Amino acid sequence: MLHLYNSLTRKKEPFVSLRPGKIGMYVCGITVYDHCHLGHARSMVAFDVMVRYLRSQGFDVTYVRNITDIDDKIIARASERDVSIDELTAQYIDAMNNDTHALNILPPDHEPRATGHIETIIRLIQRLLEKGNAYVSENGDVCYEVDTFPEYGKLSHKDIEGLVSGSRVEIVKEKRSPLDFVLWKKAKPGEPSWPSPWGEGRPGWHIECSAMAMHELGEQFDIHGGGLDLQFPHHENEIAQSEAATGKPFANYWLHVGMLQVNGEKMAKSIGNFYTIADVLKEHHPEVIRYFLLSSHYRSPLNYSEENLLNAKKALIRLYQAVKDVPPQTADSKLDEYWQEQFNQAMNDDFNTPVALSVLFQLAHEVNKSNSPALAHTLKNLAGILGFLQKDPESFLQSGLAEEEKLVIEQLIAERLKARAERNWTKADQIRADLLSKGIELEDGATGTTWRRIAE
C-alpha cells in the first residue's frame, strides 16, 4: 500500500483517495518572468514521477500545475525590458515548455493561468468578505485577516509569533496584523488591472492558487504539492483562505520537494547561484539530468555539482549497457513480477526513488548474467516510470561526444580493421585497448565493428 509523508501531520500515512481509484493533484508551478532553473526542474521531475507511478498502479490521476502570469516580479521585468507583460510571459512559457519537453516531463492535464481565472478569484474573495475573514483596507487593498482562522500555522507547525520574523510577508501599514496578506491589490498607474467590486486591481499571489485549484479539482482534493520554500507563507495562506471559505479540509496530503543546493545554499534567482535548465541541457543529456534529480529522495536536499552529474551519467551508461542487445518488446512480452514488486515496494514508501534505483541496478545485474529478454524488458519498463532508459541504447551510448571525437574513433576503428586484414593482431589489440582505456568499447559483428561508451 502507498504511504506518503504528509507535511500537514509530519508523518507517513497510508494514502486513501477521496474517490476510489481517482486522484486529484495540484502542484504550484512557476512564475514566468525568467528562464526555469534546475531547482524548478527538480520539483517538476519529482511530481512527474509521482504521476507516472500512480498511473502505473491504475489510478486515474487529474494533474494540475498552474502558471503565475501576473505578479510584481513579472511587472518589474516587463518594465525593465520595455516589453508588454503578455510578450514577456509568452516568451518564458515557451521556454518552460521547451525545457519540460526536453526533460521528458509529461504535460499536466490542466495548466491554468492566473489571468484566465480573474472572475473565479473575485468570487472566492467575495466569499471571504461575506464570512468575515477578509476586509478592505484603507488604501483599497482587500486583505485576509489571519486572526479569524484559529488553525493558522498548522502546516508550517510554528506559532503565529514565530511566523512573523524571517518570512516572505509583505509589509503593508494598512494591515490589521503583520501576517494578514493581500487578496486583491488596488490598481497602480501603468500596471495591468481588472474591474472588481472593490475597484480596479489585480489578484494577490496566494488567492490565485486556491481559486485555480478549486476550479479544476473541487473544494477538496487529494494531493497538493510544491517546493519546500512554498510551505510558508504560500501554502499556509492557501489553507487559511480555502478552508475559511468552504469550511472543509482543502487538500488531504501536502507534499514538499527539498531544495536543490549549490555549496550548501538553496539554488535561487534571488541569490544568483542558479543554473538554467537550458544551459545544463547544453552540457548534459536530458536523461542524465533526470537521473541526477531522482538520485536523492524528493524530500531531501540535493547538491548540484558536476561530479554528481558525472556519476549520474556513469550510472545510466551501466543501465543502457544491460539493455543494448535486447530484441524489441512485443505485445505478449511479460514483465517479471518479482522485480515489479521490489520496485513498487520502494515507490510505495513515499516515492523512494533512491531505493527504486538500487532495484534497477540489481535487476540490471541479473540481465547481464542471464541475458533474459523478459528481465531486460522489465528493466526498461520500470525505468520508464522514472522517465529514462527510453532512448535507443546505441544512440545514448554514443551521445555526449563531440563530432571531432566521434571522427577520431571512427578513424581508429578503420585503422584497426586494416591491421586485422593485414593480420597485425598486436596493433589491432593495441587500438582496442587504447579506446577501452578512454571508455570506448568495440564490438565486432557480422556487419562490422560498432562502438559505445562504457562506464569508466
Swiss-Prot record:
Motif 'HIGH' region, chain ranges: 30-40
UniProt: ATP binding residues: K269
Primary localization: cytoplasm
GO cellular component, one term: cytosol
Short motif 'KMSKS' region, span: 266-270
Cofactor(s) in the UniProt record: Zn(2+)
Localisation per UniProt entry: Cytoplasm
PANTHER family, per the entry: CYSTEINE--TRNA LIGASE, CYTOPLASMIC, CYSTEINYL-TRNA SYNTHETASE
SUBUNIT field: Monomer.
Protein name: Cysteine--tRNA ligase
Source organism per UniProt: Legionella pneumophila (strain Lens)
